Amino acid sequence: MVLAPGINEKAGGADKPGDKEGRLRLLDTNDPIFRDVVPKVIAAAPDAILLVATNPLDPMVELTRRLASGKIVLGTGTFLDSLRFKTALADHLEVAPESISALVLGEHGLSSVLLWSKVTIGAVLLDTYLAGRSIDGQTLRRSVEEYVRQGNINVIKGKGASEFGIGTVVARVVEIILRDDCMVIPVSAYSEKYGVALSLPRRVGSSGVLDEFEIEANKEEQEGISRSVEALKTAMKRLDRSQ
């Protein structure tokens, strides 16, 4: 069961470049909508796996988990961010996206963490690939990170909404579950380690999330994940205070 009720980014004012809240700006509006909708969904489909696609994604996953106690809950997470990461790298490096391995973890939002240390092109680490090529690594990084984090805003500015990207990801995650593909993808779910819902590499199949993988991130990336966790915990405290 795909859960996507709520106000979108443009209508909710989360489409402004430089906005420090980003998708979290939608939290106070979509919170009561989920509190109304989720119990009704559970009553209608008590055995359904719940796939959340509403922003702010990770807090909505956590809220759904609380409202649907004991049910299987996950969210599209940073799957779309990771695809944007690969696409941006492919454009800059003139390499097919299928030849690139790249992950975005943490919040599906402004505190997301691009795992640069794990990027490979044809199984070759990015730093090794760039050595001897006339590509400035820092310039590449700034350009790609802006594209990944602001990509939704640029799409909304151009056509009013960003439905096709997330629609493709929703369809793919549903397919993975229905076919029991047991594929490792960056989706959002509650993490016992971090105490909040966020995106990590997880093996997904017909029973939802089957495994959670621990990434050997470098110090900078781990600090980024910690900041993402704190941002999401702060968001959940806002929800708790609203009740």
Protein language model regions, located:
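Detector for Asparagine
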Residues: 8, 30, 55, 152-154, ...
